[in-house]
């Protein structure tokens, strides 16, 4: 198989990715969204997974599609990034219709980046604002590596980051 023209997930027509990060916190958020709600699925694994709304992705659930997917640093605190994205979606009139109200469906997963040397002594959780900023930044082209959710990612003592590919 040959990769798409950008070799990014956004080679799939209608997909967009946005990143936002905070260099002092050494953490960030990545949002995957589409021009219309998308079908999604998940396999949760690991010793201490952190997720939000992933149970909705089971085929026997009421919600048939999602409005965006969020990946965030910040461990459990990073789950608040999905609230920032959901607020931005709702303001744009996007979401699952419930009696005339829009309820954005935004599953999220986090990674543990609390021990990477960034300033985690903040008083107000920065992740909702980072989520909203990542939503506003969505595009067909986006940074890889130390960007978005990959900003503070590590694998043991090795630097991690955000990756993407297409086929």
Predicted feature residues:
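Alpha/propeptide regions of enzymes that mature by internal proteolysis
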Residues: 1-167
């Amino acid at each position: 198989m040959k990769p798409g023209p950008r070799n990014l997930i956004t080679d799939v027509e209608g997909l967009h990715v946005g990143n936002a990060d905070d260099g002092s916190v050494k953490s960030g958020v990545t949002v995957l969204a589409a021009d219309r709600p998308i079908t999604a699925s998940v396999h949760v694994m690991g010793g201490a997974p952190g997720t939000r709304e992933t149970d909705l992705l089971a085929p026997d659930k009421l919600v048939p599609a999602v409005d965006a997917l969020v990946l965030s640093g910040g461990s459990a605190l990073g789950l608040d990034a999905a609230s920032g994205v959901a607020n931005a979606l709702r303001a744009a009139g996007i979401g699952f219709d419930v009696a005339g109200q829009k309820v954005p469906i935004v599953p999220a997963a986090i990674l543990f980046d609390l021990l990477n040397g960034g300033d985690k002594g903040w008083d107000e959780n920065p992740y909702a604002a980072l989520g909203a900023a990542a939503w506003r930044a969505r595009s067909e082209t986006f940074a890889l590596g130390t960007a978005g959710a990959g900003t503070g990612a590590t694998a043991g003592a090795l630097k991690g980051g955000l990756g993407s590919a297409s086929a």
